[in-house]
Amino acid sequence: MTSRKKVLLKVIILGDSGVGKTSLMNQYVNKKFSNQYKATIGADFLTKEVMVDDRLVTMQIWDTAGQERFQSLGVAFYRGADCCVLVFDVTAPNTFKTLDSWRDEFLIQASPRDPENFPFVVLGNKIDLENRQVATKRAQAWCYSKNNIPYFETSAKEAINVEQAFQTIARNALKQETEVELYNEFPEPIKLDKNERAKASAESCSC
């Protein structure tokens, strides 16, 4: 029995500054939460080995800065991504309104082979806070309009739905990685013109 090659899944977390991208990543990978806010400069990543449908994979989770001046760093970080996580703060409506621009930014920078079906997952974070301003139905409706993106409501602080969300992220990322592998193994056939087909037919006929 041949051993399967190790799979590395690249996951990008995007969203406005302060929505909890770093906290979600730290809660998932390290089971830790800090109340001290420190803006991410540029980008940072953590790795975690997980089982996805009986397959061991390594998730490389990239946490990119939410400040506009760092969005130009995108190409290097986004290329080769297997899944993109869009995060907003349920207590800050403006962070929800910018999901469209973050999604568009990713598709432009990453240039996935099949943008229509590229896997996104949306997280509505900070549900532990009382002053909620973005309704669940509103977020679900947006996700549905974007090819039915999976949606989770999370709390990095209380570890609510973080594990479940990243299980879906890992599964969707693995599916994307597998499809890319299949595409690379079976590229489009080379089309011969009429003269080349006739020549090939004559050469193969040894009556």
UniProtKB/Swiss-Prot annotation:
Cellular localisation: Cytoplasmic vesicle, Phagosome membrane; Late endosome membrane; Lysosome membrane; Melanosome membrane
Enzyme Commission (EC) number: 3.6.5.2
Catalytic reaction annotation: GTP + H2O = GDP + phosphate + H(+)
Modified residues (N-acetylthreonine): T2
Stored InterPro entries: P-loop_NTPase, Small_GTP-bd, Small_GTPase
Modifications the protein undergoes after translation, according to the UniProt entry: Deubiquitination at Lys-191 and Lys-194 by USP32. Phosphorylated at Ser-72 by LRRK1; phosphorylation is dependent on protein kinase C (PKC) activation of LRRK1.
Pfam families: Ras
Top-level taxon in the UniProt lineage: Eukaryota
Gene designation: Rab7a
Family according to the record: Belongs to the small GTPase superfamily. Rab family.
Entry protein name: Ras-related protein Rab-7a
Chain location of the short sequence motif Switch 1 per the record: 28-41
GO biological process, one term: lipophagy
Tissue: Expressed in osteoclasts and in neurons.
